[in-house]
């Protein structure tokens, strides 16, 4: 989704952004060509930075797509356990991971995220929510017990292309995802197990740190 920041701000930030390497640019073009939702360059960079900052050994990702953010976190040396239901996207993710020499650090569960959790064990240092938007509350509650104290949760699309603040102002959510995010965001920033915030990074990015 496009950035929700004002045009001049978004253009400036884009102008100082380091260029992506050839593989990531190829993945971005693939996602754009086939309308595959992947994390933005900014959010994937944020994930990579957080993996480094927390010295993450293991990450849990809801929504592999073609592995764009998965690979960037794996590049830090972190093992990534990730979920995806689309076989073609999984095949692409595996091919890209092989080419990037990080396939041995990526474990893809080919099934719905909530089902995959039945076979996933913690602990994790980083959790990334980017699959079915209406399922975010369940992703959060089921992954938190597996997240170590001081571990980080990253939530993608938290402002849903500006629809969430618009719905907050009008009281009229545009769709089911918007309605779900209104409730999720309020609960996320007030969650007793987290120190959390929702930021305007890209399409809205939630960041939470697990308390003791």
Regions found by a protein language model. Give the residues of each.
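Conserved SAM-binding loop and adjacent beta-strand
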Residues: 17-19, 32-46, 52
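Short, basic/glycine-rich phosphate-binding loops at helix/coil junctions
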Residues: 24-30, 164
